[in-house]
Amino acid sequence: MSVSDKVEYYKIVKDILKSDEFQKRKTYKHHGDITVYDHSLAVSKLAYKWAKKLNRDYKAAAIGGLLHDFYFEPWQENQEKKPLLQKHGFVHAKEAVVNSYQYFPELMNKKIENIILRHMFPLNKIPPKYIEGWLVTLADKQVSLEVIKEPTALFQFFGYKRKKHLEAK
């Protein structure tokens, strides 16, 4: 990103980055060793960059990318057994929308809501409505997969503590 793009990007997201609530995500693990804060920042920057290049709404891409995982409880710490459709991958986008409106109502609109709500496609059946939503969805997948450096890391990516099927019998 150019210096002018970095300055512009920061102006768009500074209120989120300075928020005490968003800062807590520095302590939440995402996948592998990356935190939710670092993951969300990487997704946001990548979606912003792509949106600028494609002459799309880069502000919505930056904000939606930053808030797409704005949930309260690190999913790895929740040991509660839940039906499949109530697990983190299916519900955290709705929680992120609610939290985003609660903490950043002045930044939210229907486009950003849709970006956040639909970023888990195809896990969630309804795709993003806007190009910017697709950019955040794809950036999220790319950034998430970058943590997988070896095949066994794939199991930790999905929250499995042990790799039973890989252990010697």
Functional labels for PLM-detected ranges:
Residues 1-169:
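Metal-dependent phosphohydrolase cores
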